[in-house]
Structure formats: structure tokens, C-alpha cells
Amino acid sequence: MAMTEQQKFKVLADQIKISNQLDAEILNSGELTRIDVSNKNRTWEFHITLPQFLAHEDYLLFINAIEQEFKDIANVTCRFTVTNGTNQDEHAIKYFGHCIDQTALSPKVKGQLKQKKLIMSGKVLKVMVSNDIERNHFDKACNGSLIKAFRNCGFDIDKIIFETNDNDQEQNLASLEAHIQEEDEQSARLATEKLEKMKAEKAKQQDNNESAVDKCQIGKPIQIENIKPIESIIEEEFKVAIEGVIFDINLKELKSGRHIVEIKVTDYTDSLVLKMFTRKNKDDLEHFKALSVGKWVRAQGRIEEDTFIRDLVMMMSDIEEIKKATKKDKAEEKRVEFHLHTAMSQMDGIPNIGAYVKQAADWGHPAIAVTDHNVVQAFPDAHAAAEKHGIKMIYGMEGMLVDDGVPIAYKPQDVVLKDATYVVFDVETTGLSNQYDKIIELAAVKVHNGEIIDKFERFSNPHERLSETIINLTHITDDMLVDAPEIEEVLTEFKEWVGDAIFVAHNASFDMGFIDTGYERLGFGPSTNGVIDTLELSRTINTEYGKHGLNFLAKKYGVELTQHHRAIYDTEATAYIFIKMVQQMKELGVLNHNEINKKLSNEDAYKRARPSHVTLIVQNQQGLKNLFKIVSASLVKYFYRTPRIPRSLLDEYREGLLVGTACDEGELFTAVMQKDQSQVEKIAKYYDFIEIQPPALYQDLIDRELIRDTETLHEIYQRLIHAGDTAGIPVIATGNAHYLFEHDGIARKILIASQPGNPLNRSTLPEAHFRTTDEMLNEFHFLGEEKAHEIVVKNTNELADRIERVVPIKDELYTPRMEGANEEIRELSYTNARKLYGEDLPQIVIDRLEKELKSIIGNGFAVIYLISQRLVKKSLDDGYLVGSRGSVGSSFVATMTEITEVNPLPPHYICPNCKTSEFFNDGSVGSGFDLPDKTCETCGAPLIKEGQDIPFETFLGFKGDKVPDIDLNFSGEYQPNAHNYTKVLFGEDKVFRAGTIGTVAEKTAFGYVKGYLNDQGIHKRGAEIDRLVKGCTGVKRTTGQHPGGIIVVPDYMDIYDFTPIQYPADDQNSAWMTTHFDFHSIHDNVLKLDILGHDDPTMIRMLQDLSGIDPKTIPVDDKEVMQIFSTPESLGVTEDEILCKTGTFGVPEFGTGFVRQMLEDTKPTTFSELVQISGLSHGTDVWLGNAQELIKTGICDLSSVIGCRDDIMVYLMYAGLEPSMAFKIMESVRKGKGLTEEMIETMKENEVPDWYLDSCLKIKYMFPKAHAAAYVLMAVRIAYFKVHHPLYYYASYFTIRASDFDLITMIKDKTSIRNTVKDMYSRYMDLGKKEKDVLTVLEIMNEMAHRGYRMQPISLEKSQAFEFIIEGDTLIPPFISVPGLGENVAKRIVEARDDGPFLSKEDLNKKAGLSQKIIEYLDELGSLPNLPDKAQLSIFDM
């Protein structure tokens, strides 16, 4: 007998093991009506009819269970039909998020959409959106797919409407708000339950109960024999097992309360995304939480195409954490690494120093060095890492050593240049080493009296086959050399032919190296002839040239070079060039060979020298300071393409340093290739240790034929070791590490490939991973076991033992000294307090001053206050207001010393005449500016209203010992003056810009990775690209400077006690030098002044200049001004006209779309509420999903939600908590650390409501109230001009804050402008950044036009270069507002106009340099009326 559809449903429920989870009515009445099967696509679609909706949690459980059950057979989907759709609207709200996830929207847009409210009306679902832009975007993007998703869940929906919130929908919203409130109450209950659960778990742990999950294990054990490499996964499969290390993990909570985990793993063959839903009534979540980046897992599941990321992913059924054998250093006695590069080696090293230090400590190494290229920026982190891991840190650097003066002439002869005979010669060889390679061609010409008088050209037989590289370079073949004479014969003949002539060669050190080596092997000894190097000569006398190669010089001197890299042709070209150079030397007064070096030497000689790598190791604290001086000089004084260290500089500051020979680019390695052993040993004596590096690192030298073969390389090692033994200098094996493990090398390849001019940008890079002792011993096994142990282990440890403990960073603050600072700050504070509050100060004022002064003076901070006071005073004296940032406004002393305008005392009245005051200490008033107007009961004068109620603790900490960070907003145009004033206060050598280090950002790294893969023709899935991006992210790319940070060095120390110095981004033309260390590294050691540039003070200054109104006299509580934050009525326009419900376009802090929406939601009416808005808009998780919902559901209003960090401390103290606990809670919440059990208990004991606790738990970051108050004060002042002096406001706004103009639209009528704005709103999601900036300007222009003002076209006669000017009821734009017209051209137009009128467009082009495109734009704008294309001459002009 066939089963009924109900029986089929029961069987299905049993099979997928959810019968016990379903409601009885559903289980008994549910029907499985049919299954649509597609064998081709391997899909099954179950059609199910239910009597009522499944609870959302049960629905997700059902879907997940059925997918898991049949995952090995088919991809399963379900379509539900619900016969009784009662409460469809209620269920729609709960299913909304799931249905959104079924669409193809981006994660960001999905997140935005999930925040929206729903209203069900029959078969129509309304989604309430914020504005027309959202409505149009969502309607186009997801309407159809969202309807389909709802219908698949069983909803009877005909239409989805995206609708903006209008007043007639309020009654529909009421029921929804009740529902949300119910959910909020439920959330509060869940939070309480969660707390109780935490308590219980903590108690269990204290009882040593080890039941907590510390290792992930979900599903069945996975058989290791089933594991396959990730790179082998190329298509959908039913059951696959892999293992890999986690490099990214994301655990997301769904609305149902369940979670989904997304893990990215790699086995270093490739990478893959793994996904899994938590199962109901299982402890999957705890298992997932046990996972973290760096752990290895084994996973099994179905490989399927993820439609969203468009890539293969694994839907896991099983996952288990595994222990993976890590790389070990098994040697009994460990080595010490003396040469490694971190992420601070610009675009070359990969890991941060902390990773190296941890690895060295794990391997048991006793010490480790850091030697980045040319910089020491890893030192601060190195110190911290070494302290953490208990390992000795050795500080060093790999620098670029140059000889101070590279000679142009060698072996000076007393010979008059014009009378001398010269032999200009060139050699072609089998390679670059005169010790290991051979001459194959020697060609020369003899020159006398400016003419070539003889030639010499010979091949020589090397008795070995030429490499393909040499054949291609020289065009000499083996056949050409078969019958050639021996080199001994050629050189003997050549020596006789040369006689006593002066040798001339281009890059003479190379050619003479082969000649001298050949002479010595023949027993002649080195040549005694004079030499001139045309390469160095050109670099000296042709400083304007950027190149000095033979090809380039031949073109410059007009000399024909027919076949470069054939000796005779190169020689003849060099000869003709040299003849002209002799004339140049004569003009420079150089007449004799022995005068060349003396008369042509200059202070830039270091630029001509070829740099050799050198390793500098700090031996003691004195050496550290000397290294700082060397680094600074190399970056500031001797920078040429790269930082350079003249040998004289190293000699001057060598004390406390150990000097090593570095790598194959070092002077000693080059000498082994180019000089005999006696010369090598002589050079070796300059160094304190000799480095040899693994043969694997030199394999590319063999590949590039710079070293003949492995046997030659081994001989080079032996010569280096012999040089060390002979000179008594230790020889150590160093790894030249650039990354940790072999598999990290790909990241370095990608970074190098991103630099086209980098000499390392070759097809292969050597393996430069951090090697264990075993690996290093194995690399040098060819030396024999004893010798290998000596250089790898014994010598490195002995060298490390010679190095003292060095501390690169100070452990305390060193502030400048200013005589009498303590007394001056105290006197200034009380003097200004008495001016404001009277001679008989209120006790609250005295108490606050004394409390702050005790901390400020007691901790040595008075000088910091005094410096800030001087800077502010100078700016005020020069006519520019200064705005404060950060929490300095929390300090009443800062207020009384006029550092900030924010008064942090509780709200109060003050009589300006008789000085009586009245304070409100009960928290009933948020801001003194919100107090009602009142007259003095004693004298009748209008009272001053002040006080923002901000505790001092938010500035200097509860104990008052936190170093003050005083941030000041100066006018952008005045900022350079403020910076330079610090030089007046402290001296030029005591102030520096705070340095920053710019690293490779994720987006940039993504471009590098994609570019590399494309160039290599490699395809990788997204997860592997993400891994490679992570590998490249964070590597140093450049340096910079803090926008306003000034570092002040105390007069009793110098900058090298703290950090080296440099120019930002190595820009030698920069006006300021910066700290070499990132300023965060020395933040607690030296004073940093934040002298920032800001538009608001500049705008205030322009408004003051235009109006004559002192901004300090502007009333903060002007009713019409306050009105614009909730309606545009006081501007004389309607919401429809300006397309906005507020009047805050262009008002700082309140003009963005995000904040305008906040204003619409909250409708603030007081200053304190505006401060709340400012705090809410700058915080993280303070408004969205937090205060916004509390206000919408009526739980509290704007004034009572948590807006700024200080609100928490003040609120809790008023609630009865001890100030210390209130402070602790505030600090914990503002840093996103939530609340501890103790904090929650204390708050509940003092009857703090649950919603307040819940709000605290959600917050990730909070804005200081003093910062918000200062910003709002500036905003209200600017808003005052907008309301009462509109043209002054619009002229100032367009001049100071706007940058992208569409003048064609701006000069039109108000209807046209409004239509343009409306059209741009409809296309907002598709607009680029520039268009959005233009839209911001047009919004202001539309408002201005609807207020009755208009914009004129550019006027050749009246327009200024940079400022908008007022004419009647109009503004005239400046030339700079023309798109594509730069500052210099704008100035030039005004200058040219002052010399006389423009006669034609041609005249305009000639005098002002305007392009044809700009002239056409001005013509279209109507700015060139009656201006002819060309001037017409009249008879009277002739």
C-alpha cells in the first residue's frame, strides 16, 4: 500500500533526525507532496506542505538537517507551502535576514538591508528605507530574488515595496515597535542568562573541572589516508578530506541564534574556504571558538561552487584540530643568526621581527640579530619581542658603504694632459671576475694631440667554451678564438706597445683589474702607468646627466658607436669621447694628470662611489648612539638613490660597533672575485668579522654566470676563511634571512616583482628562509664537520658573547625644561579663574583646580601645558582661533590657561559683573549652554552660561599620571606658522616632525598578487589569493610624517638619545626632518605636540574677516540656529526644495548623509544633544544597533543614551558608584572590552537599568566628550553665519571646504540645480568619488539658490585666484574652481590681468598659459563674452 503524503513527511523527519524538534501539529499534518529530481545536475527539490509556519530556528534546523543527510547524493533545496498563513507578518520579520542571504547582494548591502523595518499589508511586504537612493538601489538589485526567497519559505507574497518613512505610516510602525521592544527585552534577559552561565562556567573552572572545550572535534574522525592536497581540488565533489593551517576564521551569529563558521586554510599547495553551521543542541560553537589562526585542522565535506564568492568551498560535515609537526632545530648546540631582514627592509623582508624572535626562542637559540637594509626601524619591536621571549637581542643594520672619494685618476703622473699619450682600451672576458675569468679580446687605440695615431686588437684563446650569455653580449664565438694566441703572448705584446702612455678606460677598475692580474701572473707586477676612468670623469664633470653609460655619452658627445660590447668599437668611441673630455678639463683648470683628483673632487664624491654592503652590529650602548648617528647621516646628508655611509663617517663613529663583511654585495666578497689573496687579506683587516652565507643563496650568481660553478664558489669560501684565519678575524656563517619558512618565499617574489627597476627582479630568487642550526651545518658540510661547526656554531656564539645587553628605547618620559613652568601654570590658572569667577573663588572651582594642578605639577606635566598655552596664544595673537581635539577639554586648567574653550565644570551660571555663580551638580542639565537665559538677581546683568560636566580623569587617568596628549586644531593656512614657532621656542635641532612608516595595505597587496599571478600565467582561487595578500601586507613601503605631530627633544639631551632622523619618504627637499622610528615607538619617551591643520578655524577666520563679527561673541543657543538641526525652516526653504529634512548641509560634523539621518531620527534641540550626536556618530557600535534602537523603541531619549565616553563615568557616579569603579567601567567600555562580572554586579546593585548594561556590552569604541563639545562649538558658530549671514557663509564654504565644482550647473536656475541633485541621488550607488564630491557642492548650491542667491560665471575682470567673492546677491567663483585649472595657472591669470586686459582667446592662452580645453570650458560658461579668437589690429595700431 502506497504511503500517504503525511506519512512520507514523517519518514523524512525521522530520517533527518528532527522529529523530536518539530511541533506535534506540524509533524502530524505536514505533507511531502513531491520530489523533483535532476540526475544531470544532481539536484533534489523537496515540495513540502505545512499547516503553519515553522519557527525560524526550526526552519533553519530542517534545512541544514536535510542538506546534511543527502549531501553525498545530491544538492538539496526545499519549497514550502503553508496552508494557514496566520501571523505571516510576524514570521516575515524573523525570516527576513535568511531570505536576504539568498539574494546575490554584496555582504555590505545585505547588512544594510537587514537593519530595515518591515510592514506586512495583505500580500504586500513593505521594507522601510531611509531615502530615495536606497529605495531605487534595493528595488533594482533584489526585488525579484527576495520575493522568490520568501515564496520558497512558504510566504504568500505578491509584491515587495521599498518605501521611505512617511507620516501616514506611523500606525503601522506601532505594532512593529512593540515587537522590537519585546525582542530587546528578550535580549536583556538573554544577556542576564549569559552572565549567570559565565559565572557557573567560571566556578567550574575554579574547581579544576576540565570539561571546557580546548580542542575542536566535530563529526566523525577523518581517516588520514583519505587526505588529498588542496591543489588537487578543481571541481565539485561529494566527499573530500583535506588538512591545512588556518590563516583566517570568521564566526558569525545568525538571527536564529545559531552560528556559521567560515575558515580559510592552506596546506601550502593551495588554499580553500571551509564552511559549517552549528547544529541545534550541540556544543559546536564552543568547538569553533577553540580554533584560531595558526592551528592545523583536518576537515571533510562536500566541495561545491559558492554562488556568492563564485569559487569552490567545502561545506564541512566533519572537522578536527590536529597537531602538526613543526620545524625543529635538533642540534645540541645552537647557532646565532647575525644577518636577517624583517618587514622593515623596504619591499624585501616579509615577517615582523617578533616572528623571528619567537621562532629563534622556540628553537632554543641563545640570541638573534636584526640587520635590515639601511634602517633600524625594527629596533623598538625587537626589544619588546626579546623581553617577551627571554632571548638576547643583537641590534644591527646592513648598510651601504662607500669610499669618500672615488678616484678619477689612478697612479698620478706628472704629465701635462695636452702633451700626454693615451692608450684607450677595452677588454672582453669570459666573466666579471679577473681572478676566475679570462680575457678573450683586448683592443686599444693610441691617442696623441687629440688624434688616434695607432690601434691594437687581439683575440686570445681561453681554452674553454664561451657561455651563451658571453656570445650574445660580445658577438664573439668559439670559432673566432680557436686559432687565437695565448693570453701571455697578447699581454706581453700589449705591454710593450703601451710603453709609458696613460691608460684610459670606461669603468677602468674593471678593465685594469684584468690587465694587472694578467701582468702579475706573467711576473711583470702591477702596471705603473697612470690611469683615467672616463666613467668617473663623466660623473664629475657632467653632473647634469642622469646616466653615464657609453651608449648615452656617445649620443651626448655626438660620437658614433657602431657595435657596443665589441672591444675595438667601444675603444674608438671612448677615445673620441675622452678627447672632448680633455678639453672640458682644460676649461675647468685641470692641466696635469696629477691634478685631476684634487681639482675635480667635490663634496658629492660619495654619489659616484659604488656602494658595498656592510653589516654593522651594536656592541654596547655607546655603539647604539653611534649607529643612530650613522643612520641619520646616511639618510639626511649622504642620501643618493639609497642611503650611503662614507668610510670616514663609519670610522668617526665606529666605537661600540662591530663591522661585518655582509653578503656577495660586500667589499670583501667582491675583492675575492677581483683581487689576489694578499689584497683580500689587507681589505679583511678593516672588518671585525667575516660573513659567509649558504651556497644556496649564491646559486643565482652561478645561474647568471657571475660565478663559474659550484667548485669556484667553494674556492671563494676557502679564500674568505683563509683571509679570516690569517688576519685573526672570526668567520661566521650567516643566513641572510628574508622570511621565516620556505613556503613564505612566494610573498617576497611577489613584492620584488612589483618593482620593475629592482635588480633582484629576476626569474629566480635564492631561498632565503630562516635556517636552523642543522640546515646551516648541512649547507657547509663541504668544509668538513669541524670547520662547519666552527663557523656555524662556535664563532657565532663567541661573537654574541662579546655583545652587551643594549636597550634601544628609553623607559621614561623626558620633557623639555622651561624655567618656572610650574609656577606660571598655577598663576595663570588662578589669575584667569579669578577674572571669570571673581576674587572669592567658588569652592568647586578651587577644588577642581587643586585636584588638577596636583597631578599636572606633581607628574612634571606643567611644561606640556605651558608649551600648548604659548602655541595657542601665538595663534590667537595672529588672529586665528584654535580648536581643541581629544580629551584636553576635560581639564579645567587647560580651560583657564586658554588652551581650550571647553569648560569641563558642571553646568553653571556666572555673572560677568558681580561674579556670582550657580552650579548644577545633580546631572539634571547636560550642558551649561542649555540653561535658560537668566539675569543676575544681584545686579540684573545677563548671566553667562558655561560648563559641559566632564571629569578630569578622562584626560590624565584616575591617578592623574597619564602623559597628557594635547591635540590642537589650528587653521590649515596657519599650521606651518605654528610648526615653525616650535623652532623659536626650543631651537631648530630640538624639534622634529613625528615620523610614520607606511606599509603595504591589503588593497595594494591584492594588486601586487594579481599582477604577479597574471604575469606568471597562474590561476589561483580566491582563498589562496587572500593568503598571498596576507603575506605581502604590512611590509614597509615608504616613510612619512604625522600631519601635525612635532617631537620635542629636551635641552639636556639630543635626538640620537631617542631615535635616528631622516626626511619623510627620503625627500631631500622636505622642509622638516622626521624621527626615524615610528612616533608610536617613542611616544612615552619624548613630548609630542599635535599641531594639526583644520578647515574650521580657517573658515571662522574668513567669516570674521567678511563680517567683522568676533566668533567668541556668537550666542551658542540661538533658537534659529538650533532649529536647522531638525528642520530647514529657519533658512527660509522647504524640505522639498532642498531635498533634505534638516538645514545642516555644509555644517561641520552634521553635514554628512549618515549624521543628517541621525538628526532626522533624533531631532535634537539642545547643545548637549548635539554633543551626543557628535559622540554617537564617531563611535563604533554606539549608534547603529544600539542607541538608535533604544531611541526608536522609546526605552530612552537622545539625552539619556550613552553618547560619549565621559557620559558613562558621570552617569554612574550620579547613580551612586564610586568614582574609581565608574572610571574603570568607562575605560573598559570605551576600549571595546565590555563589562566584567564585578562591574555588572556593582551596576545592578546601584539600580543601573538593564538596557544601560546591554548598551555598554555592545560598544567597541567611544568618542571623548571634550572633543565632541569642541567640534560642536565650532559647528554652531559656523551655522550661525549660515542662518544669519548666508552669503558670507556660502563664500567661505566654497572657498575653504569645497574642492570639486560643476560651475556649468551651479550658474543655472534653482530648478535646474535641484533636478541635477535629484538625478544624482537616483544614481548615487553608481557615482564615483569625484562625482560624490561634486554632489556635496551642488547640495549646498541648491540650498543657496533656493534662498534667493545665485552663482555668476567666472569673470576675467573680477574673479580672484582662490576666493569666492560677493557681489550683491551673488557669488563670483575664483579661477581655481574651474575643473583642471591648477594653482599656478590661477595665480598667473590674475598677474597677467593686472598687466592689462586680455585682447583675445589667443592672448589669454599666451599670457596666462590656459589650455584650449580650459578656454572652451570658460566659453561654455559664458565667461568670455565678445572675446575674439584672435586680436584684430586696427589702422591706429599700426
UniProtKB/Swiss-Prot annotation:
What Enzyme Commission number(s) apply to this enzyme? 2.7.7.7
What GO CC annotations are associated with the protein? Answer: cytoplasm
Limits of the Exonuclease domain? 422-578
* Enzyme class name: transferase
Recorded GO terms, molecular function? 3'-5' exonuclease activity; DNA binding; DNA-directed DNA polymerase activity
Biological process (GO) annotations? Answer: DNA-templated DNA replication
Q: Which UniProt keywords apply?
A: Cytoplasm, DNA replication, DNA-directed DNA polymerase, Exonuclease, Hydrolase, Nuclease, Nucleotidyltransferase, Transferase
Keyword Cell inner membrane among record annotations: no
Tell me any Pfam family this protein matches.
DNA_pol3_a_NI
Q: Which reaction(s) does its UniProt entry say it catalyses?
A: DNA(n) + a 2'-deoxyribonucleoside 5'-triphosphate = DNA(n+1) + diphosphate
Localization annotation: Cytoplasm
SMART domains attached to this UniProt entry = EXOIII (SM00479), POLIIIAc (SM00481)
Keyword Amino-acid biosynthesis (UniProt): no
Against PANTHER family, the record matches this protein to: DNA POLYMERASE III POLC-TYPE, DNA POLYMERASE III SUBUNIT ALPHA
The Swiss-Prot or TrEMBL record describes its family as follows:
Belongs to the DNA polymerase type-C family. PolC subfamily.
What does it do? Required for replicative DNA synthesis. This DNA polymerase also exhibits 3' to 5' exonuclease activity.
Q: What is this protein called?
A: DNA polymerase III PolC-type
